[in-house]
Amino acid sequence: MGCAQPRDEHGGNLARRIAVQLGLDNVPAVTVNRFCASSVQTARMAFHAIRAGEGHAYVSAGVECVSRYQDFGSAGVDPEETHNPQFAGAKQRTQRIAAANERWHDPRNDGELPDIYIAMGQTAENVATLRSISRTEQDEFGLRSQHLAEKAIANGLIDTEIAPVTLADGTVVTADDGPRPGTTMEAVAALPPVFRPDGTVTAGNCCPLNDGAAAVVIMSDVRAAELGLRPLARIVATGVSAVSPEIMGLGPVEASRRALTNAGLSIRDIDLVEINEAFAVQVIASYRDLGIDLDRLNVHGGAIAFGHPFGSTGARIMTTLLNAMQLRDVSLGLETMCVGGGQGMAIILERVT
């Protein structure tokens, strides 16, 4: 099970606690943290284990209850005291840039360490600076996500992706609470920048903070045949990349290229693409670098509308991609995302028909 913050209520090997709760105490379980790509990593681990002949069936899942996070400092620990002092200069540079006192440039060009502790919003602003992506372009993409999500929900296109959840008071949750129907360009354009006085990233062109969980079953073809099950798709290849933490939003570019190389494919072979919408700016930069047409990208909206519960997003996007591939009767799909700390992950799926 993927979880980006496996502490507090998420702690104590959450995956194992869930397995025991489900009556599966005879099934081993592990909680995996690769920040935003945590549940993609669980899928990759299952894929590798099956290919190595070390298992046949895995539940690849992820969860994040962002609303339940406790302030790290509430435990009596100053977060600053946990940071490596070697990054003090990098943190000070980030603070100057955030205050609009300095323009971002890659510190590695000066032989300096990048800021490993940098806030994600600051990395988005850095990508906007590096790639000259305007506020208007970001707002337009954010609006696109909301409108596509609104249309998909209204037409029942994502109903099969959602498992109803019954709350303690008996309320049954059957729909995502993130999308904002009726969002207009005027409303999005009126929002102030969040991270820098002169910034371009707003609440309208980045993902909201949500709670969520998602899961997929990954199984060998041998076991599926034994059980009489028909797989939806097969995993073709995966890819992982590393970039400077200060421009982590560009991680999907190299990760996708590596996955495509491992699969012996080109981006032209891919029918549908899901890039996690942590920030509009990093999706724009990524799809432009990769040469992806918009009519193939996030066709039912993305995290700007639905949210990004970090540990669960990889599995959620996989279900979204599989659903869209079925609805459009296409063969190949690419899922990719940036990862806090300066990484990227990608996974290629092929429908089994």
Where do the language-model regions lie?
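Active-site pocket-lining segment
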Residues: 6, 122-125, 236-305
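N-terminal extracellular/periplasmic Venus flytrap/periplasmic-binding protein-like
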Residues: 137-226, 289, 294-296
